[in-house]
């Protein structure tokens, strides 16, 4: 049975973005997940149902998820449904993000608890139900994971992404000067290199589900090409190395 790659888009994105990843996973079926869930409690049923159906017809299921799509995947999926995950600018601590947005909007927790929902000037609606849900349902993630993170990501701090990577034994690659939204020519080139150089088709997977390079390079193992702004920083699973 073949490998299937499922792409989960971020806010404002679409399943059609999966087309970009077909060239990066040439021997796989790549499909975009056109989900409708707007919250983790809605995603629990929708995501698990979709991935269960896909998993039944493949030998290996690879997840590629972007931004909020990564968070909804984190809150809905498990190692029984997904074999390996690639996260691009993932939201990994929704409680922290909501609290940050409350500060940006000058909204106290007491005010949000009283009003339940508050619209903001930056286009987001703060929700007391959402905040309570993520506090009551902490993320539990055991799937081998690789993360691509932009150094200038305004939604998730370096401290937060490193803490998640260390806690969940995930491999973290940082693009110097990169943003939350990978969209410029340089950023997309970096993203493509990242996937190509971390793919098992170019590498030999080890017992932990991560891949070890099967090629020789002048750079240290698994490092990505230097793209003007400096070399990528790659933190292997379990490493406490600082950026």
PLM features: what roles do these ranges have?
Residues 229:
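Cationic, low-complexity basic patches in intrinsically disordered or flexible, solvent-exposed regions
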Residues 82-163, 167-174, 178-201:
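The alpha/beta-hydrolase serine catalytic core
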Residues 212, 216-221, 233, 242-243:
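Short glycine-rich, low-complexity segments
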Residues 52-60:
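Gly/Ser-rich "nucleophile elbow"/oxyanion-hole loop immediately N-terminal to the catalytic nucleophile
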Residues 76-77:
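Aromatic pocket-lining residues of Rossmann-like dinucleotide-binding sites
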Residues 32-53:
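Catalytic nucleophile-loop/oxyanion-hole region of alpha/beta-hydrolase
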Residues 3-27, 32, 36:
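Short, surface-exposed "cap/lid" segments of acyl-processing enzymes
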Residues 64-69, 73:
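Gly/Ala-rich beta-loop-alpha elbow adjacent to hydrolase catalytic centers
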């Amino acid at each position: 049975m073949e490998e299937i790659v499922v792409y989960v888009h971020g806010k404002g994105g679409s399943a059609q973005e999966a087309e970009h990843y077909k060239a990066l996973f040439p021997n796989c079926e790549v499909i975009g997940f056109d989900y409708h869930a707007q919250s983790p409690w809605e995603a629990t049923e929708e995501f698990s149902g979709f991935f269960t159906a896909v998993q039944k017809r493949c030998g290996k299921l690879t997840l590629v998820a972007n931004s909020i799509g990564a968070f909804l995947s984190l809150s809905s999926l498990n190692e029984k449904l997904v074999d390996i995950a690639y996260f691009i600018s993932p939201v990994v601590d929704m409680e922290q993000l909501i609290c940050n947005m409350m500060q940006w909007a000058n909204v106290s927790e007491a005010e949000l608890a009283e009003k339940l929902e508050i619209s903001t000037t930056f286009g987001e609606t703060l929700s007391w139900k959402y905040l309570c849900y993520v506090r009551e349902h902490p993320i539990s993630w055991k799937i081998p994971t690789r993360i691509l993170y932009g150094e200038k990501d305004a939604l998730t701090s370096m401290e937060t992404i490193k803490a998640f990577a260390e806690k969940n034994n995930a491999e973290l690659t940082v693009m110097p000067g990169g943003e939350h939204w990978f969209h410029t020519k340089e950023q997309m080139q970096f993203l493509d290199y990242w996937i190509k150089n971390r793919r098992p088709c170019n590498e030999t997977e080890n017992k932990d589900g991560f891949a070890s390079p099967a090629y020789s390079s002048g750079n240290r193992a698994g490092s990505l090409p230097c793209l003007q702004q400096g070399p990528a920083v790659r933190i292997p699973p379990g490493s406490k190395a600082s950026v």
